[in-house]
Amino acid sequence: MKRLSIISLLLWIGMVAFATGKSKVMWLDCSANFQRFSYPDSIRYYVDKCHEAGITHLVLDIKDNTGEVLYPSKYAAQKKNWKNFDRPDFDFINTFIKAAHAHGMVIFAGMNIFADGQNIVKRGAVFDKHKKWQAINYVPRKGLLPVTEIEGKPTMFLNPALKEVQKYEIDIIKEVVRNYAFDGIMLDR
């Protein structure tokens, strides 16, 4: 019941934000822009450009399909490096939130749920820490296989039927809600 209440609250917050007029939303992908968004002045520059273009809402991707997050977490691995680039140590999320709010923009956390591994680079919880939690898929002529054994599958998913997986994902969401002043959360996948 408690879990349902939290999810209902998050959905309500998101709906209220979008119902207040014509929104223009920009999704800021954390992997594609990892290096670009690795400096406070660069973040402020891009938020300024979004505001100048009439964007009213930002969705900041903070948990991508590797399952790594862009903040220090008690639950998930933190993405500090991507494509041989090491991000300098600074408060990435609050830099975005402050810049967006300074322009009166709404900012949501974008979070991939149950997507916790990227097969192309072999990164994510399904490859190491939570290998036993990976989803099992039916593959014609091969039967049931763990997602990490399926060729050509770029995104690896955790098994949402497992209670420990549900708790893990909810703990990450709660952690974000407790620690950051986002205006809402967009759940992806």
What are these regions (language model features)?
Residues S42-E68, N179-Y180:
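Catalytic domains of carbohydrate-active enzymes, especially glycoside hydrolases
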Residues T56-L60, F92-T148, G184-R189:
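Glycine-rich, aromatic-flanked loop segments that form ligand/cofactor-binding clefts
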Residues L10-A19:
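Hydrophobic h-region of N-terminal signal peptides that target proteins for export
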Residues Q35-A53, K79-H103, K167-Y168:
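Aromatic- and glycine-enriched glycan-recognition loops and surfaces
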Residues S23-F37, F114-N179:
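Active-site-adjacent "subsite" loops/lids of carbohydrate-active enzymes
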Residues I55-P88:
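Aromatic-lined carbohydrate-binding/catalytic grooves of carbohydrate-active enzymes
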Residues L9, S31, K63:
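Flexible loop residues that form catalytic
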Residues M1-L4:
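Positively charged n-region of N-terminal signal peptides that target proteins for export
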